[in-house]
Amino acid sequence: MFHLDTLATLVAATLTLLLGRKLVHSVSFLKKYTIPEPVAGGLLVALALLVLKKSMGWEVNFDMSLRDPLMLAFFATIGLNANIASLRAGGRVVGIFLIVVVGLLVMQNAIGIGMASLLGLDPLMGLLAGSITLSGGHGTGAAWSKLFIERYGFTNATEVAMACATFGLVLGGLIGGPVARYLVKHSTTPNGIPDDQEVPTAFEKPDVGRMITSLVLIETIALIAICLTVGKIVAQLLAGTAFELPTFVCVLFVGVILSNGLSIMGFYRVFERAVSVLGNVSLSLFLAMALMGLKLWELASLALPMLAILVVQTIFMALYAIFVTWRMMGKNYDAAVLAAGHCGFGLGATPTAIANMQAITERFGPSHMAFLVVPMVGAFFIDIVNALVIKLYLMLPIFAG
């Protein structure tokens, strides 16, 4: 086994991103279907490591100590760039999107349990291949698998959960681009151009140019560091209470409170462009690390019936995004970008959703509403409603005892 330390892993992640960029610009298929650069590069590296593992018996182990801080830094930038006025304006849209998301959670579990029963598997495996890991991700999967082991005696719950979450992360990044590209073509907005081309003015005067200087970067890094520090403290204080929240949600909300508080007091205005640059860097590096570190041989160990459930879930996610998400959200360009985001966190995670949306907006134009709604629902509300839906399913007679 080869072990790469923190710095070597960072080098590998940056090279993976550059490789992904080269691939997307060189391979017409990837460019045509708007595959995110971290997904393209990360998957190629993961496949290369799989070949090394199977042919030579070599395994490369990465030091992922930077991965979680990078993810938290990304969510901090989402919070710092959110202003209260925009949140109020997006209230109705957030409500509609949340209803759409709840519908998917219910259907994912119904499909998982139905397919598991049809294939003669434990219904708990169907739940693990449902909203627990697909909409919930690795963290939610790990948390629920512990409960399944202790309460239901499902000894392989953790392995199944991690494999399903990994599969979902990969597919979530792959189907978002093609789905959105199809929807943009059929959008009610002429030529796929977004209705909202206005420059966001939450913290910036669009007519006044500002440089991203070293001082601005230091100020922005300080704000992000404060969000991470305070967010972790808040998460620890809430742990074990009825108000317990994942750390990244606490970090996001600290960012919202910090930026709006400073703005209201007139003490400091967050430089949106600098925050966005650092957020994009954090997200790209996080995704590169997450994907290049995938142990694809763990997917190969999944039984064919489990793979069958996951394939059905993936097809259903794409159809749901096209026929439900896009239509419910208005059948316009914003709705198409939202659908791409829904594919991302409906099968994988919120960072995958953001990467999907970035890949679309870089090509077709901005969608301020999508970048406001998806992080709010995907990073906060999804954990709450998913837990409620899962608990309701566990009350069914098939899970008694």
Curated annotation (Swiss-Prot):
The chain crosses the membrane at residues 7-24, 33-52, 70-87, 94-116, 157-179, 213-235, 245-267, 277-292, 302-324, 368-390. One of its GO terms (cellular component) is plasma membrane. Residues 25-32, 88-93, 180-212, 268-276, 325-367 are cytoplasmic. It comes from Escherichia coli (strain K12). This is Sodium/glutamate symporter. The gene is gltS. It is a multi-pass membrane protein. Pfam families: Glt_symporter. Residues 1-6, 53-69, 117-156, 236-244, 293-301, 391-401 are periplasmic. Inhibited by the uncoupler carbonylcyanide m-chlorophenylhydrazone (CCCP) and the ionophore monensin.
